[in-house]
Amino acid sequence: MSRPAVIGILTVSDRASRGDYADEGGPAIRAYLAEVLASPWEANERIVPDDIDAIAAAIRDLAAAGCCLVVTTGGTGPAPRDVTPEATERVCTKLLPGFGERMRQVSLAYVPTAILSRQTAGVCGLSLVVNLPGRPKSIRECLDAVFPAIPYCVDLIHTGVDHPPRLETRPERLVAFRPKNA
C-alpha cells in the first residue's frame, strides 16, 4: 500500500497567527479534503502572518517536507498586507494562471467583489501551490471549481518520480479529470 499523500494547509492571517481569533480557513480546507479525497492523506498545517517572507518560507518548507499540494487561505485581496500571491510567485518556478482565472470566474457568480481577488497557483519543487480566499464559503466554491484538475496536475508534477503520490477523489462527491491514458 502506498504512503498517504501529504497536503500542506497554510493559513495566512495576522490576527489568527497572533491568536486574536480562531482560524476558520485552515479547518475549512481540511474538512473539504476529508469530504472529497478517497485516497489516504495527511495534513501539514501552518499559520503565518501576512508577511511576504514568512509566507514564502512556509511554502518552501511545506514543499521541502514532501507536500504534493500546498493550499493557502487568505491574503489574496488588494489590501496592502495581502501578499500571498506575491509570495507564491516568488517561490514557484512555474505559474499556473488558469487556477486563479477559474476561481475568479466562479466566484463572480456569487459576489461582484470577486474581481478584486488575486488568487494564483504554481509549482514549487514537487508541490502544486494553490491560493484560496479566506472565507470558508468562498474556499468551498473555489475548490469545487478547481479541484477536478488538481489530482492530474499533481501526477504531471511528479512525472518520472519513484512512488509518486496519487490523489483519488470520491466520485459521488467530485470527479477528478484524468486523460484516459494517464
Regions found by a protein language model. Give the residues of each.
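Non-catalytic beta/alpha edge segments that cap or flank active sites
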Residues: 1-182
